[in-house]
Structures are given as structure tokens and as C-alpha cells.
Design a protein with these regions (language model features):
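Short, well-ordered secondary-structure micro-motifs within conserved domains or adaptor modules
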Residues: 1-5
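Active-site-flanking segments in enzyme catalytic domains
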Residues: 6-182
Length: 182
């Protein structure tokens, strides 16, 4: 992965977020992460959020070719409210947002834009919690769907990568581990 630090990023299409702090894409068959150094105030969360998009590319690709790959969009969607569909747009998420979903199904209204953003928000927050020294986050406890998404994504990451040399608990899994210990 190549990482590019840049100045202000702005949307040049109707489909994108107006002022992104970063994005992940491909350039000459390499995954690149581009970060806006002017708008990024929470580097740990933003970098982890964008890294999650690269992880998603790996998991989605692998799920097409590995018969028993854990990751699937169908499994992910099973943790969402009945009849829920992601907006598949960065615009107007606020008008579709239900406060009843907050901390139960989704972290925030940005999480309902795309499934990839939902996962990125969860992963980014888990890493930010680790960097802040938090080993407990009540949003990621118990049997609620948000915690089930978090645990599922952690398991998918372990399933989708060669974990040789990894710690038994990685930084993004610390909230999961604290739940196991309690």
C-alpha cells in the first residue's frame, strides 16, 4: 500500500462525500491511501477508517475465490435492522437516520451510507479507542447488533489474512478481548 499526504481534498463528482479526510483507491494495480493533512484531526481513527477500506477490498476479493471464506455482504447485512438497505450515497444520510439505531445497529449517520463505511466507522473507532487507552466501549458489549458486527469483522480480518506472527489480540480487537474477560 502506498500512502499519499496531500492538501485539501474536494469532491469532483455527485457521488462522493463533499470534503473527505481521505480515501482508498487503486493506482497501477497498487492500493493507495490518500489523506488530507488539512482536515484530519483524529489521525488514528482516520487512518484506521481508510485502512478498513483496503481490508474490505481484500476480504471481498478473497470471498469470491475461497469457498469457505467467512466474509460476505449477506452475513454482514444480517446484523442490520429488518428491511434496512444502505443508501449507497454520501448525501442526505441525516434524513434517513433513526436515533433508535444509534449504538444499537450503527455508530452514526455516516454508517448508513455504505456497508464499507459502516465497517470503516467500526474499525476506526476500535483503533481510536485502543490509542486512547480505552479497553471498554459500551457500544461494543453484550449481544447487540453493533457488537455482533464488530466481532464478525474482527473474525473476518483474521480469516482473510495470514496471521502468522500476529499477537493473539490485535489492537482493533482489544474491545472484543475486554468483553471476553468480563
Amino acid at each position: 500500500m502506498e500512502i499519499y499526504l496531500t492538501g485539501n481534498l474536494t469532491d469532483t463528482t455527485e457521488e462522493q462525500f463533499e470534503y473527505p479526510a481521505g480515501f482508498v483507491s487503486e493506482l497501477n494495480s497498487h492500493i493507495i491511501m490518500v489523506l488530507d493533512t488539512n482536515s484530519c484531526s483524529e489521525w488514528d481513527r482516520t487512518i484506521a477508517h481508510e485502512l478498513s477500506h483496503a481490508i474490505d477490498r481484500r476480504l471481498a476479493f478473497r470471498s469470491q475465490y475461497v469457498e469457505h471464506a467467512l466474509f460476505s455482504e449477506e452475513a454482514w447485512n444480517s446484523f442490520n435492522p429488518d428491511s434496512f438497505s444502505y443508501l449507497n450515497s454520501y448525501h442526505d444520510s441525516g434524513q434517513y437516520w433513526s436515533k433508535d439505531w444509534e449504538s444499537v445497529f450503527f455508530l452514526n449517520s455516516y454508517s448508513i451510507t455504505y456497508a464499507t463505511e459502516d465497517r470503516a466507522e467500526i474499525f476506526g473507532n476500535a483503533v481510536a479507542n485502543y490509542h486512547s487507552g480505552w479497553s471498554e466501549d459500551l457500544r461494543f458489549t453484550g449481544d447487540n447488533p453493533l457488537n455482533q458486527k464488530y466481532e464478525y469483522y474482527c473474525n473476518c480480518i483474521r480469516d482473510g489474512f495470514d496471521t502468522t506472527g500476529w499477537s493473539s489480540v490485535m489492537p482493533w480487537e482489544m474491545l472484543k478481548e475486554s468483553e471476553i474477560e468480563n
